[in-house]
């Protein structure tokens, strides 16, 4: 399961409706970034193995540590940040070849360590690209999200996605065909 963005009850209903499975059947979870929108279901997936690209784990840890330092006097904020840090430390770093015909595809920019998954087949290349290509509108306009950590890096990653994939699974939309390749 990649970027489990729905609340657990809703995702469980979707999994059951579409594939006849429930959250307990999920064995692996991959996040394209540590963005809170990408991890809403994690509380229902404690039994699964969690993976995230190492640069994303490192950059998220630095960001949380920085916020902890600045929130030194606010115990409530420190407690919340501590929970985020505990959650982050539960992630493992995947191999570059996560599964057969599934490779990591780093797409830094939206966050410093954003990473997609490249699904290789004989006829098409599918890229789960997270928020590097957020929606159909972003793809059509050739733009990235305005809240990127580094817009220049995000745009470079966006261009790499366009060059390599036939089909995109964007971060906030349904599956999209690459207009240059279709």
Model-derived features with residue positions:
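Active-site flanking residues adjacent to catalytic metal/cofactor-binding acidic residues
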Residues: 2, 32, 52-53, 128-131, ...
């Amino acid at each position: 399961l990649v970027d489990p963005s729905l609340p657990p009850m809703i995702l469980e209903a979707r999994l059951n409706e579409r594939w006849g499975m429930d959250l307990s059947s999920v064995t692996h979870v991959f996040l394209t970034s540590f963005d809170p929108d990408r991890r809403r279901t994690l509380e229902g997936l404690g039994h699964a193995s969690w993976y995230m690209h190492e640069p994303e784990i490192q950059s998220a840890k630095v960001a949380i540590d920085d916020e902890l330092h600045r929130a030194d006097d606010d115990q409530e904020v420190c407690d919340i940040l501590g929970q985020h840090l505990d959650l982050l430390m539960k992630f493992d770093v995947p191999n570059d070849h996560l599964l057969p015909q599934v490779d990591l595809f780093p797409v830094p920019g939206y966050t410093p360590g954003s990473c997609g998954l490249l699904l290789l087949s004989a006829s098409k290349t599918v890229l789960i690209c997270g928020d590097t290509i957020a929606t159909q509108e972003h793809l059509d306009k050739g733009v990235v999200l305005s809240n990127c950590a580094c817009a220049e890096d995000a745009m470079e990653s966006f261009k790499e996605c366009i060059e390599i994939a036939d089909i995109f699974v964007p971060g906030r939309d349904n599956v999209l065909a690459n207009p240059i390749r279709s």
